[in-house]
């Protein structure tokens, strides 16, 4: 748990780049979040059919790309069914607003280059396609080690999927990991310990004095998603938690 003792990450983390102010999980979103003063970003990473890690939240492409028009209605909408060459041609910005039309899906390599060049930090949520949890964790971890080689602060890998974190741990145990929770299911603390995690990342409503004490007493850092109200953020600060993931890059000052 020594990594948790010397936690290098800031309190404020921009959700999917810049929350809802820009197309999520794009470099345009990262650039906008940075303009608001954020220095750490959260993003979702999955694999193309040919094993390229890229940013996308959903299992399917329709909500945040023009896949219906570009790929056609008769073809699979599942992102992981397509090679990167196909995915790279999609517009991942036009759905949000006309000003972002033409913004592509970024690879993890592109995001790493941007973050490293600007000394920004990254939280990679591993978002595997069902059935490929362990493999996705392995590949994302391998890429992360290669991309951040020689950098002072590696990315924080998180996932709701235990098998994805197992894959990351077994492949690159030196990378910091965090278990994502939407409920405090039976055995959550023991599972995080078994996975060698450094952090617990909860739905913010799950944190209270008891759960914070349990996690911190076991050596974990305590992070929350997705916090968009001032009262909720203040409650978490008062509880002594360590990190807040927010869409509201326009509301919260990361310097505060």
Regions found by a protein language model. Give the residues of each.
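Phosphate-group recognition and catalysis centered on beta-loop-alpha active-site segments
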Residues: 1-256
